[in-house]
C-alpha cells in the first residue's frame, strides 16, 4: 500500500504522480467496495427465491443498489466527507480528534460516538476478509461442485498466509494492488456490458422513483432486503479513512472515472441476466461469465478480495496507532515495515486479534451466505456515527447554523438509520457477532481511558508540586543530595507535579544530576506536528529544565530524534551521557477506589499489554533506568 502523507488534494506530485495516486487509490481505497458485487444481489434476492423472482423485484432491487451507491458513496463520502479533513487526514478517529480540538475533550457524546465508530471498524476488519475470500472461492463450485466442502479450509489457509506476511511489510507487492484492482473493475464492467442487453428493462432502475415504488409496495420484506442492499456500499468508509494516504482528488477521480461506472454496469448486467434467466439468481455474478472465463475470473476475484482484505487490515493498524496516541488504548508494539514510508506499520497484537477473529468466523459460519447475514451492522453503525460527527463538524468547524446543518444531513441520517434498522433485524441470524465484537472493543477503550484519567487525578492529588520541590532542593544545606555529572531525564504525564521516579531516585540513591529534565510527551488532536512546534524548553532553575515534546496522533513518537532538535534551540546535552528514568508501575487492586471491580480487572489486564515506554518512545535501552512503584486502583 502506498501510504504517504499527502496534501489535502493529492495533486502536488505532477500529472504522472497524480495518475499513480489514482491507480493506488483504486487498489487500496476501493478494494472492499469492489468485492461487494460478488454477493450483494444474490443476498438481496434471497427473500424472494421461494416464490421465484419477478420483474418488479429485480428492477426495484437494482434501483435501490444504484441509488444507495449514488447517495451514500457519491454524495456523502466522495463529495462531502472527503472535504471534512483533519489536516489532510480522514477517518472516524481523525474527525473525532478535530472535534475534540474545537469543542474540548469533555464532550461525552462525541467521545462515545468516536469509540463506537472505531470499535465497529475493528469488527468490520474481521468480517470483510472472511466474507470476501469465501465469496470469491465459492465461484469454483460452478466449475466443480466437489470444491464446495474445501472452501472454508482454503479460505482459512489464505487468511493465515495473509496475516503471517504482515510483519514483513507489503511495500513490494502493494505496487501490484492498483493494477490488479483496475483489471478487476474492468472485468466487472465487461461482464455487465455483455449482459445489459439481455433485458433492456433493467435500465428503468436508473430512475430513483423505481426504488421508492419498490419499497412502497414491498411491505415488511422491503425492510429486510435493505440489509442486503446495503452490502453494495460496504467498504465506503475506506474512502474517508485513507484520505491521508492518497489525497482527495485522486480518490474522487478514481471513483468517477472507473469505480462508479464499473459498479453500475456490473449491477445492471446482473439484474438483466436475472430478468432473462431467473435461475441465475443463485449466483448472478459468476454466471455472467462464459465457462472459458470462469476460472480466470475466480482467480482475479480471489486476488481482489485478498487486496481488499489487506486494505482493511492496514486500516485497522492505522486506527490502532491513532487510538494509542489519542489515549484510547495502551501503548502497543508498533513496528515500521518501511524505512521511507511511515504509513507502513505492523501492530502484532492487532494482527493476532484479527487473525483469530477471522478464523473463528470462517469455522463458525462455513460459507459466505451465512456470514453475509452478520455483515452490515458494523458498517451501517460506523456510517451513522460518521454522519453524527459530520453534523458537529458542520457546526463547529465550518460554522453552519443548526438549521442548515440539519437540512443537509438529516435526510442522509434517516436513510442510514433505516439501513441500520434493517441490519439489526439480522441479530438472531449472526448479526450479534459484530455487535458483540464492537461492544467488547468499546468497553476496552472506555476502561483504558477512564483508568488513565483516574490515575492522572490520583497522581495530581498525591504528588508534590514541582515548583515547591525545586525551591526546596535548590536550597543549600547539609542534607542536600550529592551532585553527580551528566543529565537525568524524568518522564512524567503530569508536568507540574514532581515525578515519583525522581523522588524514588533521591530516596534510594541520594544523588542529583547536574542537569535534570522533566520530560512530558504530548499528543495533539491533529495528525502531524511540524518540527518547528515539536519541542518547548522552560528553564525552571539552574539545575532543572522542563521539556515538552509534542507529536501528532499519526506521528512516530520518536523521543530520541526529537531530543536532537533541542540542540538547535541551544539546549545541549550528549545522549550517551544522559540517563532516562522511568517509573514501572505495578497496579494493585483495592476495594472502594475509583473504578468498579470489573473495570479494575480489565484495566489491569490492558496494562499488561502495554509495552515499556523506552520501546514506545525509542529511547536508548542502555541509558534507561527503571524504578518500580505500586499504585492502588
From Swiss-Prot:
Record-linked Pfam families: K_trans, K_trans_C
Sequence similarity: Belongs to the HAK/KUP transporter (TC 2.A.72) family.
Function according to Swiss-Prot or TrEMBL: Transport of potassium into the cell. Likely operates as a K(+):H(+) symporter.
Reaction(s) catalysed by this chain's protein: K(+)(in) + H(+)(in) = K(+)(out) + H(+)(out)
This protein's UniProt keywords: Cell inner membrane, Cell membrane, Ion transport, Membrane, Potassium, Potassium transport, Symport, Transmembrane, Transmembrane helix, Transport
Membrane-protein topology: Multi-pass membrane protein
MF term (GO), any: potassium ion transmembrane transporter activity
Keyword Aminoacyl-tRNA synthetase: no
Protein name, as recorded: Probable potassium transport system protein Kup 2
Highest taxon of the lineage: Bacteria
GO cellular component terms listed in the entry, alphabetical order: plasma membrane
InterPro entries in alphabetical order: K+_transporter (IPR003855), K_trans_C (IPR053952), K_trans_N (IPR053951), Kup (IPR023051)
Alphabetized HAMAP family for the sequence: Kup
Subcellular location: Cell inner membrane
Residue stretches spanning the membrane: 18-38, 61-81, 107-127, 145-165, 176-196, 211-231, 255-275, 293-313, 345-365, 371-391, 402-422, 427-447
Amino acid at each position: 500500500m502506498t501510504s504517504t502523507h499527502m496534501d489535502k488534494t493529492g495533486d502536488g506530485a505532477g500529472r504522472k504522480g497524480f495518475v499513480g495516486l489514482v491507480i493506488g487509490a483504486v487498489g487500496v481505497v476501493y478494494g472492499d467496495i469492489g468485492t461487494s458485487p460478488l454477493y450483494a444481489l444474490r443476498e438481496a434476492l434471497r427473500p424472494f427465491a421461494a416464490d421465484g423472482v419477478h420483474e418488479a423485484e429485480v428492477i426495484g432491487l437494482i434501483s435501490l443498489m444504484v441509488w444507495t451507491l449514488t447517495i451514500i458513496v457519491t454524495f456523502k463520502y466522495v463529495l462531502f466527507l472527503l472535504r471534512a479533513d483533519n489536516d489532510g487526514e480522514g477517518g472516524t478517529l481523525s474527525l473525532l480528534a478535530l472535534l475534540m480540538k474545537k469543542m474540548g475533550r469533555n464532550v461525552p457524546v462525541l467521545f462515545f460516538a468516536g469509540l463506537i465508530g472505531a470499535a465497529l471498524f475493528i469488527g468490520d476488519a474481521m468480517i470483510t476478509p472472511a466474507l470476501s475470500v469465501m465469496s470469491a472461492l465459492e465461484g469454483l463450485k460452478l466449475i466443480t461442485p466437489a470444491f464446495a466442502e474445501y472452501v472454508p479450509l482454503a479460505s482459512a489457509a489464505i487468511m493465515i498466509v495473509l496475516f503471517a506476511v504482515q510483519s514483513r511489510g507489503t511495500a513490494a507487492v502493494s505496487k501490484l494492488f492498483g493494477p490488479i484492482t483496475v483489471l478487476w473493475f474492468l472485468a466487472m464492467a465487461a461482464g455487465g456490458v455483455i449482459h445489459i442487453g439481455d433485458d433492456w428493462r433493467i435500465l428503468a432502475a436508473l430512475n430513483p422513483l423505481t426504488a421508492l415504488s419498490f419499497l412502497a409496495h414491498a411491505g415488511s420484506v422491503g425492510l429486510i432486503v435493505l440489509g442486503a442492499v446495503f452490502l453494495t456500499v460496504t467498504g465506503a468508509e475506506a474512502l474517508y479513512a485513507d484520505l491521508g494516504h492518497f489525497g482527495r482528488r485522486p480518490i474522487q477521480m478514481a471513483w468517477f472515472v472507473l469505480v462508479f461506472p464499473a459498479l453500475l454496469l456490473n449491477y445492471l448486467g446482473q439484474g438483466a441476466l436475472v430478468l432473462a434467466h431467473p435461475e441465475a439468481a443463485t449466483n448472478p455474478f459468476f454466471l455472467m461469465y462464459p465457462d472459458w472465463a470462469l476460472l480466470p475470473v475466480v482467480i482475479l476475484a480471489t486476488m481482489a478480495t485478498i487486496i481488499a482484505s489487506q486494505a482493511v487490515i492496514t486500516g485497522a493498524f492505522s486506527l490502532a496507532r491513532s487510538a494509542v496516541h489519542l489515549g484510547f488504548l495502551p501503548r502497543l508494539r508498533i513496528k515500521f515495515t518501511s524505512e521511507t514510508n511511515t504509513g507502513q506499520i505492523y501492530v502484532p497484537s492487532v494482527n493476532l486479534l484479527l487473525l483469530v477473529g477471522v478464523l473463528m468466523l470462517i469455522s463458525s459460519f462455513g460459507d459466505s451466505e451465512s456470514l453475509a447475514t452478520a455483515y452490515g451492522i458494523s458498517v451501517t453503525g460506523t456510517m451513522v456515527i460518521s454522519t453524527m460527527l459530520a453534523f458537529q463538524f458542520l457546526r463547529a468547524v465550518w460554522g453552519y447554523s443548526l438549521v442548515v446543518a440539519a437540512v443537509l444531513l438529516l435526510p442522509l441520517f434517516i436513510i442510514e438509520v433505516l439501513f441500520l434498522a434493517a441490519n439489526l433485524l439480522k441479530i438472531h441470524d449472526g448479526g450479534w457477532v459484530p455487535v458483540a465484537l464492537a461492544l467488547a472493543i468499546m468497553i476496552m477503550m472506555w476502561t483504558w481511558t477512564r483508568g488513565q484519567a483516574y490515575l492522572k487525578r490520583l497522581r495530581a492529588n498525591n504528588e508534590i508540586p514541582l515548583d515547591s520541590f525545586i525551591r526546596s532542593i535548590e536550597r543549600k544545606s547539609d542534607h542536600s543530595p550529592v551532585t553527580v555529572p551528566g543529565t537525568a531525564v524524568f518522564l512524567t504525564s503530569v508536568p507540574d507535579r514532581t515525578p515519583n521516579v525522581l523522588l524514588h531516585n533521591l530516596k534510594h540513591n541520594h544523588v542529583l544530576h547536574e542537569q535534570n529534565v522533566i520530560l512530558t510527551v504530548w499528543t495533539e488532536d491533529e495528525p502531524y506536528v511540524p518540527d518547528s512546534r515539536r519541542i518547548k524548553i522552560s528553564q525552571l532553575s539552574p539545575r532543572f529544565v522542563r521539556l515538552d515534546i509534542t507529536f501528532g496522533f499519526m506521528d512516530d513518537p520518536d523521543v530520541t530524534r526529537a531530543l536532537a532538535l533541542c540542540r538547535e534551540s541551544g539546549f545541549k546535552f550528549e545522549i550517551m551521557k544522559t540517563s532516562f528514568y522511568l517509573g514501572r508501575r505495578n497496579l494493585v487492586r483495592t476495594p472502594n477506589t475509583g473504578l468498579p471491580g470489573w473495570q479494575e480487572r480489565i484495566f489491569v489486564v490492558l496494562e499488561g499489554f502495554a509495552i515499556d515506554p523506552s520501546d514506545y518512545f525509542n529511547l536508548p535501552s542502555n541509558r534507561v533506568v527503571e524504578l518500580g512503584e505500586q499504585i492502588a486502583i
